[in-house]
From Swiss-Prot:
This is Prisilkin-39. Expression is confined to the prism and organic layers of the shell with no expression detected in the nacreous shell layer. Also expressed in the mantle edge, extrapallial fluid, hemolymph and, to a lesser extent, in the viscus (at protein level). In the mantle, localizes to inner epithelial cells of the outer fold and the outer epithelial cells of the middle fold at the bottom of the periostracal groove. One of its GO terms (cellular component) is membrane. Keywords: Biomineralization, Chitin-binding, Membrane, Signal, Transmembrane, Transmembrane helix. Binds chitin and may serve as a framework constituent participating in shell formation. Inhibits aragonite precipitation and may regulate aragonite growth during shell layer formation. Does not affect calcite crystallization. Residues 78-197 are annotated as: 10 X 12 AA tandem repeat of G-G-Y-[SG]-G-Y-[GS]-Y-G-Y-P-[AT]. Coiled coil: none annotated. It is a multi-pass membrane protein. GO terms for biological process: biomineral tissue development. It is found in: Membrane. Residues 1-19 form the signal peptide. One of its GO terms (molecular function) is chitin binding.
Length: 406
C-alpha cells in the first residue's frame, strides 16, 4: 500500500506545473545547447566579422583572423583529406574537388566554406582561400576571381568587401588591398588603380605609405604593413606585416616582421611561388626570398601539394617529404607544394628544399625545371653565414632567415 501511495505522489508531482516547467527548461536548454554547438562547429569569426553559421564565416575580425575552419555542410567528415574528390566537411582538404566545408582546403574546386582554402575554384566562404575563383566571403583569399567579402584576398577579380585584398579588380571595400583595380575603400593598398581611401599604400597612386625600393618591392614598417614586388621574371609579389625594419639588397625581397603577416611571391614564370607568411622578427636575405616566421603562416607553390608538420630536422631534395603526424608529400615532377610545421631546425643543401621551424609555419616551392622556390618559417635558427644554393648565398641573421632558389 505504501508503494502504491508513493507512486501516486510521484505522478501527482510530475503532473504539476513545476515539473512541466522544469521539463520545458531542460528541453529549451537542450535545443539551445545544440544550436550553440552547431554554430560553434561552423566556427566563430573573430571580432567585427561576427560568427559563421555552419562553416560560413562572413568576415574577419578586428585583427583579420577568421577562426571558422571547420564544420559546415555535412557532406562528409573531416580528417586530413588529401586529394579528396568527395565531400569532406572539415580537416585538411587538399586537392578537394568536391564540397569541403572546412579545414585546410587546398586546391578546392568545389564549394569549400571554411578553413585554409587554397586554389579554391568554387565558393569558399571562409578561411585562407588562396586562388579562389568562386565566391569566398572571408578568410585569407588569394587570387580570388569571384566575390570574396572579407579576409586576405589577393588577386581578387570579383567583389571582395574586406580583408587584405591584393590584385583586386573588383570592388573591395576594405582591408589591405594591393594592386586593386576596382574601388577599395580602405586598408593598406599597394598598386591601387582604383579609389582606395586610406592605409599604407605601396606604389599606390592615391595615397602614401612606407614604400620600399628595388624592383617594385614595397616592404612595410608597422603592424599589418603590406608590400608588393613585381621585379622582373624572378620577382615576388608579397603582402606582409612589418612592425620593424626590413632589409634586403636586390630583386623582389619581401621580408616581414609581425604577427599574422602575409606575403606572396610570383616570379620566374612557372618557377614562382605564392605565399603568405608571418614574421615577428627581422628577415634578412639577398635575392627573391620570402622568409617568414609566424603563427599560421602559409605558402603556396606551383607544383605538387602537401601538408605536413615536423618536430624533427628534415633532410631532403626537391620533394615535399615530411616527418611527423599528418605528413604528406607529393613527388610527381620532382616538386612539391608543402605546408608544414617544424619545431626543430631543418637543413638542406640544394634544389627545392623547404625546411621550417615554427608553429604552423608554411612553405611552398615548385620543383626543378621551373625553378626552385622555398618559403620557410623559423623560430630559432642562428646563423652568421647562411646557406649557399645554386651559387647564391642567403645569409641569416639572429634567429630567422629563409631563402628562395631561382
Amino acid at each position: 500500500m505504501k508503494g502504491f501511495l508513493t507512486l501516486l505522489l510521484v505522478c501527482a508531482i510530475l503532473s504539476t506545473g513545476y515539473c512541466q516547467s522544469r521539463r520545458r527548461a531542460a528541453l529549451t536548454g537542450l535545443v539551445a545547447g545544440a544550436t550553440i554547438g552547431a554554430l560553434a562547429s561552423g566556427g566563430l569569426g573573430a571580432g567585427a566579422g561576427g560568427f559563421g553559421v555552419g562553416g560560413f564565416p562572413v568576415g574577419v575580425g578586428a585583427v583579420g583572423i577568421p577562426v571558422a575552419v571547420g564544420g559546415g555542410i555535412p557532406y562528409g567528415y573531416g580528417g586530413y583529406s588529401g586529394y579528396g574528390y568527395g565531400y569532406p566537411a572539415g580537416g585538411y582538404g587538399g586537392y578537394s574537388y568536391g564540397y569541403p566545408t572546412g579545414g585546410y582546403g587546398g586546391y578546392s574546386y568545389g564549394y569549400p566554406t571554411g578553413g585554409y582554402g587554397g586554389y579554391s575554384y568554387g565558393y569558399p566562404t571562409g578561411g585562407y582561400g588562396g586562388y579562389s575563383y568562386g565566391y569566398p566571403t572571408g578568410g585569407y583569399s588569394g587570387y580570388s576571381y569571384g566575390y570574396p567579402t572579407g579576409g586576405y584576398s589577393g588577386y581578387s577579380y570579383g567583389y571582395p568587401t574586406g580583408g587584405y585584398s591584393g590584385y583586386s579588380y573588383g570592388y573591395p571595400t576594405g582591408g589591405y588591398s594591393g594592386y586593386s583595380y576596382g574601388y577599395p575603400t580602405g586598408g593598406y593598398s599597394g598598386y591601387s588603380y582604383g579609389y582606395p581611401t586610406g592605409g599604407y599604400s605601396g606604389y599606390s597612386y592615391p595615397t602614401g605609405g612606407y614604400s620600399g625600393y628595388s624592383y617594385s618591392s614595397t616592404p612595410g614598417y608597422g603592424y599589418y604593413g603590406s608590400g608588393s614586388g613585381m621585379g622582373g621574371m624572378r620577382s615576388g609579389y608579397s603582402y606582409y606585416s612589418s612592425p620593424a625594419p626590413s632589409y634586403y639588397s636586390s630583386g623582389s625581397m619581401t621580408p616581414g616582421y609581425g604577427y599574422y603577416s602575409s606575403g606572396s611571391g610570383i616570379g620566374g614564370g612557372m618557377g614562382s611561388g605564392y605565399s603568405y607568411y608571418s614574421s615577428p622578427a627581422p628577415s634578412y636575405y639577398s635575392s627573391s626570398v620570402s622568409p617568414g616566421y609566424g603563427y599560421y603562416g602559409s605558402g603556396s607553390g606551383m607544383r605538387g601539394y602537401g601538408y605536413y608538420s615536423s618536430s624533427t630536422p628534415m633532410y631532403y631534395g626537391s620533394r615535399s617529404t615530411g616527418y611527423g603526424p599528418f605528413s604528406s608529400g607529393l613527388g610527381g615532377m620532382g616538386s612539391g607544394y608543402s605546408y608544414y610545421s617544424s619545431s626543430t631546425p631543418s637543413y638542406y643543401s640544394s634544389g627545392s628544399m623547404t625546411p621550417g621551424y615554427g608553429y604552423y609555419g608554411s612553405t611552398s616551392y615548385p620543383g626543378p625545371g621551373y625553378g626552385s622556390y622555398s618559403y620557410r618559417t623559423t623560430s630559432y635558427q642562428p646563423s652568421s653565414y647562411g646557406y649557399s644554393s645554386y651559387g647564391t648565398t642567403y645569409p641569416g641573421h639572429g634567429h630567422w632567415h629563409g631563402h628562395k632558389d631561382c
